[in-house]
């Protein structure tokens, strides 16, 4: 995969956050349109993170058409944040908070920067949800510390790794209650297991893209799988970006779908 095979385009488009994508009938429709999926991903009944133990986490907030949007992201260099395309598409600018545990507290460790420079993958299409990846360029380089640090990305030698069967975790400030959709002030996490994409295809009734990873919660856990854009991490390495879950709710046992980071290693401007 050549360095120039992918290119950036400035994020533009309509607001599709908090919109459930579903169909009323499966008759006569392609498989990709048959499944009901949600663009919202939230951690339900997750555990609170030890404060500042995940210094790579970024909280991404913006307002689109008078609607406040909250996403997750990860710091991949001192001036770049990795997130999902859906988190910046349609936005004119975003607030990126680093070094946070409790978003409602004025923690000394927190830094909030406003960026209007963010890019989505040129092949991203909301209807298909493939290539759901974007990079936010911060206006200045941030000082790295025990509170703000970059996350490790896979090596090129990891491109063929499916990670199936491996334990992973995802974190975010998303919902803690599937019914009331209450957001969490503090960073929370959930342990997951990477599962074969075939299991996702059974759940969602359409063929998964080659750039996607599926992960499920441990047996008996009623969760969704993290804020959109949040990193999926295996052994301290980010292998995925939270993309979407089921429209039927966060406690219905559907796996979460994540963008596969290894597919985009040569696309990232590092």
Each predicted region: which residue ranges?
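Extracellular/lumenal ectodomain signal focusing on beta-strand-rich modules
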Residues: 78, 116-117, 150, 172, ...
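C-terminal subregion of chymotrypsin/trypsin-like serine protease catalytic domains
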Residues: 12, 17-18, 23-26, 58, ...
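Chymotrypsin/trypsin-fold serine protease catalytic domain
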Residues: 14, 105-106, 133, 138-139, ...
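Conserved H-D interstitial segment of serine endopeptidase catalytic domains
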Residues: 60-63, 81-84, 88-126, 197-199
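Extracellular/periplasmic catalytic domains that process cell-envelope and extracellular macromolecules
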Residues: 48-53, 75, 88-90, 126-130, ...
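Protease-domain processing segments flanking chymotrypsin-fold serine proteases, especially trypsin-like
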Residues: 1-82, 95-100, 212
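Acidic glycine-/aspartate-rich tracts in secreted/extracellular proteins
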Residues: 63-65, 86-90, 99-104, 139-144, ...
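Active-site region of chymotrypsin-like
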Residues: 54-65, 71, 143-149, 193-228, ...
